[in-house]
C-alpha cells in the first residue's frame, strides 16, 4: 500500500528485516534508526499475518481496517467512560472518525503517522479510568504507549501525542477534583511520564 509520503513498504516481512536494527545498512551509506519503525507491534503482527496466510491481501486489509477501527474504538471508550449512552458514544466516535480532518489524514494509509489519532483517545481513556489507581495507571499507560510505539516514529507527532497526554491529564484532574490540585496533577504527570520512559526505553535510547 503506497500511502502518504509514498515510501510505505508493501512487504512487511522485508520491512521487519530491514528496520529491526539500530542501523539501516541498506540505504546508501547507512543511517541511524532513530525510531521504532520496524520493531513496533504493528510490523510484527503484520509480518506474522503475512507469513501465516501467504496472502498479502489479508495483512493489508487488517492494516486498513485497524487504521480506521482503533480511533473509533478509542473515542467510543472515552465517551462511555464519561457515561454517555451507547448510541451517543457511537455517534461521538463516528464523528471523530469521519470528520474531514481525520478522514483525510487516515486516507493516506501511513500507519506511522495516522496511528497517533488512535493513541490519543486511548491514553485519555486510560488516564481517566485509572486516575485514582496509580499502579494501574502506570502499567496500562506505559503498556499502551509501548504497543503504539510506532505512533511516535514521526517525532513531531510524538511530541503532539505527549502534549495531548499532558492536556488530557489537566482536564481529567480538574474533572475529578472539581478544581485544580496542582500537587496531585504533578504527581500524576510524573507517573505517566515515568511509565512512558520505562516502557519505551528500548527505542528511546536510539535518540541519544
What are these regions (language model features)?
Residues 178-185:
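Membrane-interfacial, low-structure loops and terminal tails that flank and connect transmembrane helices
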Residues 54-58, 84, 150, 184:
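Juxtamembrane loop-transmembrane helix junctions in multi-pass integral membrane proteins
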Residues 18, 133, 179:
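Extracytoplasmic
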Residues 31-32, 174, 178:
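Amphipathic alpha-helical interaction segments
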Amino acid at each position: 500500500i503506497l500511502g502518504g509520503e509514498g515510501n510505505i513498504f508493501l512487504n512487511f516481512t522485508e520491512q521487519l528485516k530491514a528496520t529491526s536494527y539500530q542501523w539501516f545498512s541498506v540505504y546508501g551509506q547507512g543511517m541511524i534508526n532513530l525510531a521504532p519503525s520496524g520493531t513496533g507491534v504493528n510490523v510484527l503482527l503484520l509480518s506474522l499475518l503475512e507469513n501465516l496466510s501467504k496472502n498479502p491481501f489479508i495483512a493489508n486489509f487488517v492494516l486498513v481496517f485497524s487504521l480506521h477501527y482503533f480511533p473509533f474504538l478509542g473515542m467510543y471508550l472515552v465517551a462511555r467512560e464519561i457515561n454517555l449512552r451507547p448510541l451517543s458514544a457511537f455517534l461521538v466516535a463516528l464523528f471523530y472518525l469521519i470528520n474531514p480532518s481525520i478522514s483525510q489524514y487516515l486516507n493516506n494509509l501511513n500507519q506511522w503517522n495516522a496511528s497517533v489519532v488512535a493513541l490519543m483517545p486511548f491514553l485519555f481513556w486510560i488516564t481517566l479510568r485509572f486516575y485514582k489507581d496509580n499502579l494501574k495507571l502506570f502499567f496500562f499507560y506505559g503498556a499502551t504507549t509501548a504497543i503504539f510505539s510506532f505512533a511516535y516514529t514521526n517525532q513531531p507527532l510524538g511530541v503532539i501525542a505527549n502534549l495531548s497526554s499532558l492536556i488530557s491529564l489537566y482536564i481529567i484532574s480538574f474533572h475529578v477534583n472539581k478544581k485544580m490540585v496542582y500537587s496531585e496533577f504533578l504527581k500524576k504527570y510524573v507517573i505517566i511520564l515515568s511509565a512512558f520512559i520505562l516502557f519505551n526505553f528500548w527505542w528511546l535510547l536510539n535518540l541519544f
